[in-house]
């Protein structure tokens, strides 16, 4: 009887020690992976910051930004509230702090502000067969009797066992 108790006791100790060692092992792997990911993301940010030139305080703004400034002054809306996330004393400080990641800043700097002129809608009298407003009949398939179909958990487990639903063609 003493040997049976000793065997159970040994088994419990082995199980507890193995669980503790597994937890330590997973914690160490998690720590090493997080440091590796932080190092890689730091390298990516450094590479991106080297590629993106920082705008100088006397940076020339595109015409669309000037127009937006004019419309905002007409409406008496403060510029810092609409363009920048963080309040600061100088515009260059708020520009640097408003965009924490360089790729997002790069995306806004590379925008081409060209003037787009739309043609008059009267000139576009194109009666193409693909015009969605001129389609006389369109077909769509809808479920005829949705109340008859009872949801079942097994449809998600095995789609081959699902019963087919009735569909009918409807003209719109």
From Swiss-Prot:
Up-regulation conditions: Up-regulated during erythroid differentiation.
Region of interest: Disordered: 52-106
Assembly information from the UniProt record: Interacts with EPOR; this interaction occurs in a erythropoietin (EPO)-dependent manner. Interacts with JAK2; this interaction occurs in a erythropoietin (EPO)-dependent manner. Interacts (via tyrosine-phosphorylated form) with GRB2.
Protein name: Regulator of hemoglobinization and erythroid cell expansion protein
Gene Ontology, cellular component aspect: plasma membrane
One GO biological process term: erythrocyte maturation
Biased composition (Low complexity): 91-103
Species in which this protein is naturally found: Homo sapiens (Human)
Post-translational modification: Phosphorylated. Phosphorylation on Tyr-132 and Tyr-141 occurs in a erythropoietin (EPO)-dependent manner.
